[in-house]
Amino acid sequence: MSSSSDYSKILQTAYNQFLLPLGGKKVPTPYRRNEIGNFQKLGPEFQGKSSPNVIQKAAKQLAKEQNFYFEKASIEEIREFLRKNKLGIDCSGFSYRMLNFLSQKVTGKSLEGHGFPHVGRTNVNKLTSDEFSVKISIFEDCQPGDIIKFDSASPDGIPHAAIILDNQNGVVSYAHSSKQTKPEGVHTGEIANGKLPEDLLIFSFNIDKGDGIRRLKILA
């Protein structure tokens, strides 16, 4: 099994793929969640679960059709173009893609190869379920690849997740995709000495209601 530092490097590589190379720029993938009830009405690249390569390919094709020039646009203008065209990734899609990349590098098998459902049929509750993960009770024991679960008791029943990238000297770095935060979409942040940053304070975090740190069994 690889070391924690290896996990961190692998996850950073996975994250960098979500900084889409468009027009000579690195464009952070925006947030995209398919509307409830429309899952089968859109192509897979528009459902908020696609790989960075698929999103990039679709973006280039749509830009060609719409005469949009990435080279002349700012990063935010490109991100707005992606949003308008329903291209991006939601929090569970991002988490799945990050962990799938890690699994392939560490175990030689994809998440599906380990029995996980397809990315389009997986959500945060499934990733953090007792079937596929174990609870990490002490925050300081978290490692790269662990999942931080928030909003387990949210009224809409949809929790949020962030993936831990590293844990060094009391500073835990993480990555997630969110619509509610600033910046929106895929981005990173840090938790210093166990104190949640403003980026994460918009989400509830209540251990008694199911929130906390989870580690995939295949990485435990």
Please give the residue ranges for each predicted region.
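N-terminal capping segments
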Residues: 1-105
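Intrinsically disordered, low-complexity segments enriched in small/polar residues
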Residues: 35, 41, 46, 111-113, ...
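Alpha-helix initiation/capping motif
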Residues: 51, 107, 123, 188-190
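Short linear motifs in intrinsically disordered/low-complexity regions
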Residues: 91, 124-126, 131, 152, ...
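...with weaker cross-activation on analogous glycine-rich loops/strands in unrelated enzymes
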Residues: 106-182
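Low-complexity, Gly/Ser/Thr/Pro-rich intrinsically disordered linker/tail segments
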Residues: 177, 186-220
